[in-house]
């Protein structure tokens, strides 16, 4: 990813949060260290929404467990929201979380006996990947930067 934006600006830039190698989607890259801290520190609880493709249908019971909370090795995690993406394909779910713990979405589903086939972050702190082809990037507009600095988005 950093190779794609290598010449975006003269300052040092770095990713805000992380996506593992097998995850696609929204990744904010900045040269503003204060903003990066604000967006990644758990106390600021920035919303992340993922589209998750799983190896089998997710049961209603497991959907409820995820909503209520699941105990993992590093503590409990629960989704702020979870739903099926398509009515006719119960192996695809959308999940909204605020946690920034490493590989949390994958670990959550693996704990319940599922294998994540594909994971795509579709929303982060008010930003989406809408109209942005995979492997491409764009500068934020002034309003988006101001919204992030003011904490206008979860």
What is each residue range found by the language model?
Residues 1-154:
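Basic, flexible Lys/Arg- and Gly-enriched helix-loop patches that mediate nucleic-acid binding at interfaces
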């Amino acid at each position: 990813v950093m190779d794609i934006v290598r010449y975006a600006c003269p300052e040092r830039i770095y990713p805000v949060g992380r996506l593992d190698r097998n995850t696609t989607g929204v990744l904010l890259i900045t040269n503003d260290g204060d903003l990066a801290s604000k967006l990644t520190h758990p106390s600021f609880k920035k919303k992340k929404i993922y589209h998750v493709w799983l190896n089998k249908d997710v049961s209603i019971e497991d959907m409820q467990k995820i909503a209520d909370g699941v105990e993992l090795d590093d503590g409990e995690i629960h989704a702020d929201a979870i739903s099926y993406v398509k009515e006719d394909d119960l192996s695809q779910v959308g999940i909204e979380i605020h946690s920034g713990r490493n590989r949390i979405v994958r670990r959550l589903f693996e704990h319940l006996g599922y294998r994540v086939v594909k994971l795509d972050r579709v929303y982060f702190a008010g930003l989406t990947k809408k109209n942005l082809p995979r492997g491409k990037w764009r500068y934020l507009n002034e309003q988006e930067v101001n919204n992030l600095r003011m904490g206008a988005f979860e």
